């Protein structure tokens, strides 16, 4: 979330290397002067110009670069088409014909999970990529994203009216209605499996998931009403470097090495899901298409991979306006006017401070003591969960605790948005030692620490760890400065993702409770409660 990095930057806590998933130059504008210009780097030079243009500032500088793409289009049940003798769509007209043909058999031709903001937003843009990629469209996008613009930029009167007309026609041609606004991803997949739905809007990963279940599926592009074909894409993440690196040539060289690796072919192959196609924006990365995406190879080879406009405003306003169009409340003209008005509206909401930290704590790991900011969070959360001991995987927290006032959203951002869960159990000292060992030494099916910074943070106990042969070994656990008695009983809360906890949860003889509430939600509720306070850090680890 770019708001998170803006908050860090305003309080002197911007990291050297930052990544972001939901991204737009519009939202990144406040960070521009704090980021390195990457325009002259080899990594930027390798990005196809058609895509690099989406990341260029008005002055030609480039602060962010994209890694590989997640492609979105139409996932189709090809077996259903063959069963009813309906040709696969090759353009917009045949897409509409297919929808009508399926309707005669009592099958929905197209639907999607319109309960989500991104589905609303990407449908609006995907149907009009040709218009948005035209000279007029690029001109508007540059103005909307320009960091130098001090005034709000609304929709233009050329490209966007046509986009809403295209969406209005699509809603009519596919029969979308108010009932579709309640559908989530699982609802759509269930209908695909049951033969009740022929096509939905989603990522190429959906083709593999259906194929793994024995369903003959295919992936098709967006069909523009002008005859062109496009894929909607979103980078798995964007990466930027802090301008502070320019003051330290050694750190800058290391950061550039990290950037080089992030954008390498090997790294991008590791980013995509197993079996998913690798679609890169870089000329240095080979195109790798599985059978699932062979139908869209010509689209990819034409560089018809549109990078969505993904500002916070576009997510929220698209959800509101597109939903109202689907529900029949807005015409194309009314939707255009409503969207434009919301883009131009003044920001009147002032978020309330829910948490104040008078001190700042670094997230640098020290062999004698650990990570001060992680200790603050672990100690505070131990109180929140009313537990004797808390063990937190290293990827539980986002970074330094800043000396700043936190709003509810900023406080929530102190917890990693990775589905972190809380698990609780009463156990003996001996069992606690083995639980800590699992976090420190790792396991094949869970998570294994790979450097000092990835060791867990603990609260209510202190641990001794030995670093050897590229790994770590637990050598001691103390509580209140004394060795932990094996028969002492304590309540223990573990913070970890479901995958990290899987090996511990596999032992039915020592069941954990919980795993059904996200730590981020619990922390947000605590911060918003009116009496939130941060605990002091402690020396929780000695690494030898």
Enumerate the language-model features and the residues they cover:
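Extracytoplasmic "Venus flytrap"/periplasmic binding protein-like
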Residues: 1-50, 79-90, 190-191, 198-199, ...
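Extracytoplasmic/periplasmic solute-binding protein
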Residues: 63-65, 96-152
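Glycine-centered hinge/linker elements that transmit conformational signals in sensory
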Residues: 143-181
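Long, aromatic- and glycine/proline-rich binding clefts that accommodate carbohydrate-like moieties
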Residues: 217-220, 270-324
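Conserved C-terminal helix/tail region of periplasmic/extracytoplasmic solute-binding proteins
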Residues: 82, 297-353
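Catalytic centers of hydrolytic enzymes
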Residues: 351-544
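Hinge/lid segment of periplasmic solute-binding proteins
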Residues: 21-72, 87, 96, 122-123, ...
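Extracytoplasmic/periplasmic substrate-recognition and gating elements
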Residues: 84, 211-274
């Amino acid at each position: 979330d770019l708001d998170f990095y803006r908050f860090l930057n305003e309080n002197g806590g911007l990291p050297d290397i930052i990544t972001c998933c939901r991204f737009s130059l519009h939202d990144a504008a406040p960070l521009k002067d704090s980021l390195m210009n990457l325009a002259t780097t080899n990594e930027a030079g390798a990005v196809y110009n058609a895509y690099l243009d989406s990341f260029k500032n008005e002055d030609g500088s480039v602060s962010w670069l994209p890694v590989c793409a997640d492609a979105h289009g139409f996932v189709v049940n090809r077996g259903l088409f063959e069963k009813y003798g309906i040709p696969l769509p090759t353009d917009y007209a045949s897409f509409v014909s297919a929808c009508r043909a399926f309707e005669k058999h009592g099958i929905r031709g197209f639907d999607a999970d319109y309960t989500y903001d991104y589905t609303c937003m990407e449908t609006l843009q995907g149907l009009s990529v040709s218009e948005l990629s035209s000279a007029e469209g690029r001109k508007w996008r540059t103005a909307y994203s320009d960091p130098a613009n001090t005034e709000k930029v609304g929709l233009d009167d050329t490209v966007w009216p046509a986009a809403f007309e295209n969406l209005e026609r699509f809603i009519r041609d596919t029969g979308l209605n108010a009932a579709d606004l309640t559908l989530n991803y699982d609802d759509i997949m269930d209908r695909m499996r049951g033969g009740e739905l022929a096509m939905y809007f989603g990522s190429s990963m959906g083709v593999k998931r259906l194929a793994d279940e024995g369903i003959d599926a295919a992936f098709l592009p967006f069909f523009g009403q002008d005859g062109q074909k496009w894929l909607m894409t979103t980078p798995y993440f964007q990466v930027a470097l802090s301008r502070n690196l320019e003051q330290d040539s050694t750190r800058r060289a290391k950061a550039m090495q990290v950037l080089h690796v992030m954008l390498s072919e090997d790294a991008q192959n590791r980013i995509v899901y197993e079996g998913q196609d690798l679609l890169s924006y870089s000329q240095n990365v080979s195109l790798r298409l599985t059978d699932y995406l062979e139908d869209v190879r010509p689209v990819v080879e034409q560089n018809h991979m549109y990078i969505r406009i993904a500002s916070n405003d576009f997510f929220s306003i698209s959800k509101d306006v597109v939903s109202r169009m689907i529900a029949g409340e807005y015409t194309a003209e009314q939707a255009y006017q409503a969207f434009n008005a919301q883009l131009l509206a003044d920001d009147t909401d002032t978020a309330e401070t829910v948490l104040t930290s008078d001190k700042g704590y670094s997230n640098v790991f020290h062999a004698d003591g650990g990570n001060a900011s992680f200790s603050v969070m672990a100690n505070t959360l131990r109180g929140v969960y009313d537990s004797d001991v808390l063990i937190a995987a290293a990827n539980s927290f986002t970074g330094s605790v800043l000396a700043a006032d936190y709003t509810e959203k900023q406080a929530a951002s102190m917890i990693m948005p990775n589905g972190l869960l809380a698990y609780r159990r009463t156990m003996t000292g001996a069992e606690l030692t083995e639980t800590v060992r699992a976090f420190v030494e790792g396991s094949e099916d869970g998570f294994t620490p790979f450097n000092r910074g990835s060791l867990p943070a603990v609260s209510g106990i202190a641990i001794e760890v030995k670093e050897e042969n590229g790994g770590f070994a637990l050598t001691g656990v103390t509580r209140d400065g004394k060795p932990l008695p094996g028969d002492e009983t304590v309540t223990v809360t573990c913070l970890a993702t479901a995958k990290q906890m899987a090996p511990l949860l596999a032992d039915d003889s020592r069941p954990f409770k919980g795993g059904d509430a996200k730590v981020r939600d619990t922390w947000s509720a605590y911060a918003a409660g009116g009496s939130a306070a941060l605990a002091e850090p402690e020396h929780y680890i000695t690494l030898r």
